[in-house]
């Protein structure tokens, strides 16, 4: 995970009041459907982005260009927050507190330490908390709306899983940065040519030594633009197919693109690469058990004592586990099979049952064990390692297809929402009016 400042400031979606100018009357910068973007929102995020860029070593463009990017970001956030309100989506305090606690834990900080670090950088905890709530709301709206537009067919999963099995680099991960030069819906040829010319110019500038992050902040329409276009780590096969195809033979430091898609022209930078090729092996157990259920006719102590007596008889050789299971076990599914449960992952069992089972040696019988089902006498018959690579590959293939399609569809959906919204820019603020 990126350092905590990048994470915190990367999530900022409203103004940090610590940066506003209280002596001035706040102004409306843009009307967005039934909401507004305030000038203080823009000013606050402008200062936050500059501070974050300084701490991350990123160069930023001039204020006019940066304000344009920030206003577009705030307009999209405003649209999505209004959608959340209409849809009745809320983030509970409990969910919010857990998300913040997770952020702190992932950055190896206590909540108290996070509060102190926020204060040191001029961010009040309450303001930050509400910023995270809004980010969670916009993510929830986007996820709900985009997810329903995605269809994954079984043959797609089979095909990708087979492809992954044939590719040595199927699990290659890349750390990427991204610039999107957008196109409007139904663009004219002139608009396409202008966007392509700009994309080609940016590629040439980057290859000539220009800072990718600065150009991303100044030009990209991607949601990560204000973070210098940094996408972070992701598996090759999780990327949009247009990207994955072009990155198959890419190497660290390479600039890839421009790549034309339905939403514009994309430029990628491969910041780093890492790979992992592994076989998925899991432990399965073959166990048998005898179950006694406490009832008005049998107390817990009586059930335990009866199982202890049964264990003593089995260990002395007077009877077998299978025989006594058929006689007294109250598990109808296994009693007639001599208590045999068959091969299975230990994780399917009740935690108390599982934990006791995993402590046994082959052939060993447990002491009476209490679970949510009653009292058990357990015997571990055998264990084995099973190759689950094929099943795991299909599961990964499904996740990769979903992530790939989500990334492609999310950008289209966001452009559609921006085009459909009523947006009026006031006082010459920099944005694309509708």
UniProtKB/Swiss-Prot annotation:
Q: Where is the PpiC domain?
A: 171-272, 282-382
Name the chemical reaction catalysed here: [protein]-peptidylproline (omega=180) = [protein]-peptidylproline (omega=0)
Q: Please state where this protein is localized.
A: Periplasm
Q: Which InterPro entries match?
A: OMP_Chaperone_SurA, PPIase_dom_sf, PPIase_PpiC, PPIase_SurA, SurA_N, Trigger_fact/SurA_dom_sf
Recorded hits in Gene3D superfamilies, A to Z, give: 3.10.50.40, Porin chaperone SurA, peptide-binding domain
The EC number(s) attached to this protein equal: 5.2.1.8
**A Pfam family annotated for this UniProt entry:** SurA_N
Primary location class? periplasm
Annotated keywords: Chaperone, Isomerase, Periplasm, Repeat, Rotamase, Signal
Top enzyme category: isomerase
- Could you mention a single GO BP entry for this protein? protein stabilization
GO-annotated cellular components: outer membrane-bounded periplasmic space
Enumerate the SUPFAM superfamilies for this protein.
Answer: FKBP-like (SSF54534), Triger factor/SurA peptide-binding domain-like (SSF109998)
The UniProt GO MF terms for this protein read:
peptide binding; peptidyl-prolyl cis-trans isomerase activity; unfolded protein binding
Tell me the leader sequence span. 1-20
Per its UniProt record, what HAMAP family does this chain match? Chaperone_SurA
Any domain commentary? The PPIase activity resides only in the second parvulin domain. The N-terminal region and the C-terminal tail are necessary and sufficient for the chaperone activity of SurA. The PPIase activity is dispensable for SurA to function as a chaperone. The N-terminal region and the C-terminal tail are also required for porin recognition.
- Free-text function comment from the UniProt entry: Chaperone involved in the correct folding and assembly of outer membrane proteins. Recognizes specific patterns of aromatic residues and the orientation of their side chains, which are found more frequently in integral outer membrane proteins. May act in both early periplasmic and late outer membrane-associated steps of protein maturation.
Q: What is the name attached to this protein's record? A: Chaperone SurA
Organism per entry? Yersinia pestis bv. Antiqua (strain Antiqua)
Higher taxonomy: Bacteria, Pseudomonadati, Pseudomonadota, Gammaproteobacteria, Enterobacterales
